[in-house]
Amino acid sequence: MIHLFVKHLLLIFFYVFSTNLYADSNNQFSVATAHEIATRTGLEILKKGGNAFDAAAAITASLAVVEPYGSGLGGGGFWLLHRNLDNKQVFIDGRETAPLRSKKNMYLDKNGNVIKGLSLNGPMAAGIPGIVAGIDHIVKHYGTLKLHDILEPAIQQAKTGFIVTPRYQKLIQYRENIIRKYAITSDIFLKENKIPAIGDIIIQSDLANTLTMIARDGSRSFYHGNFAQEMVNSVQENGGIWETYDL
């Protein structure tokens, strides 16, 4: 069922680029992200003794919770980082990839015309996620803290929720009609099928559970085993083309 796919990954079928900037600093660190909660998360990790790589991974996880209109575990991303110790520049490619069953004409009808919305909404629009693998790779190869320490702030943020802002309302409105088509998604990101009021709290318990699983068992638990099979089954049952070998 589609709700398995959506509620575990919390992959929302819309994407926008973030334009807001939230910065904070103390005498030692400066952090700027697209959301104030993610900025605080980065500072928290640095104050715990983590390095910039740890902070980048934790911020990514936090944005997956508090910025669902632009980030998420079901998507992809990349990181350009600098290691001062040896003056090394590091680029991490965690972009999503197309399922192996993808075809160049899969978004066209028999007459060669584009099928409206097929490449944007629903399981056929979903690439194979790279964010989780990217976070795990950064922490393992460049970080100083453990994965569970990196993900703990995002886990708590998903459990307790974040406050609806005018920005949230504006960006959700762009895809409100699409969200309504998926009951589990609308139950989380809308209130009674309407855009939430400013000050409402968005809680994502299933996302918290997914992050907890990753924190405990690593990224392999996301891409292999029962969880991965659930994702693939859900996508296929709703017309998508994922296979377990894609993950």
Describe the role of every protein-language-model region.
Residues 1-10:
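Bacterial N-terminal signal peptides that target proteins for export
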Residues 18-20:
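N-terminal signal peptide c-region/cleavage motif recognized by signal peptidases
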Residues 24-40, 44, 52-217, 222-224, ...:
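Noncatalytic scaffold domains of N-terminal-nucleophile
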